[in-house]
Amino acid sequence: MGYMGCWCSNLGRKYSGTVSPQRSVQPEALSYEMVYSWQQSFDTLMSFKSGQKCFAEFLKSEYSDENILFWQACEELKREKNSEKMEEKARIIYEDFISILSPKEVSLDSKVREIVNTNMSRPTQNTFEDAQHQIYQLMARDSYPRFLTSIFYRETLASFGITEMDIGGDEEKEREQRAERARLNVPATAAEGSSKDISMV
């Protein structure tokens, strides 16, 4: 049986409330096609709640899950309409992720940190926009490539019966996988909404 720890375990440290990113988040019917698509780009991975959760588990193993928690908190702030609650959330985000006294401080350059400090004089939904963008790019550039070769991602793929594949997105390997599914008469979306595994022979 494949390793499915990413899906049943919690994020560890949770930000207040349920995080539903502002960007379009895809349906949660877990399938091989969904998990395999996470190789396409970091944007694709982050468009799935399950993708975010598995990536968060990976970051937690590297002691850097504050990055995705900060990003998610900023997304939550963007949706807040009540001005008083918005200011309170902005203050909490600052104390949790920006303050140099916080154990969860994210890594920002001096220019962006100065922008955040200035914005905090009158917090808005976009107070941390520059900081959020910088952390997103950091995760995409630094953590995402390692995630694709991590046990969290490989064993999630293995849970669908895929035990050997080029995690880098090798086109020839992908064509072979598609041809094998066609030979077995397995539709591309067979795993969606179903508990059946896609097995390779």
Swiss-Prot record:
One of its GO terms (biological process) is chemosensory behavior. SMART domains: RGS. InterPro entries: RGS, RGS_sf, RGS_subdom1/3, RGS_subdomain_2. It holds the Pfam family RGS. Residues 168-201 are annotated as: Disordered. Residues 170-183 have a biased composition (Basic and acidic residues). Keywords: Signal transduction inhibitor. GO terms for molecular function: GTPase activator activity. Expressed in most or all neurons. Inhibits G protein signaling in nervous system, interacting preferentially with the G(O) subfamily member goa-1. In vitro, protein acts as a GTPase activator of goa-1. Rgs-1 and rgs-2 redundantly adjust signaling when worms are fed to allow rapid induction of egg-laying behavior. This is Regulator of G-protein signaling rgs-1. The lineage of its organism: Eukaryota, Metazoa, Ecdysozoa, Nematoda, Chromadorea.
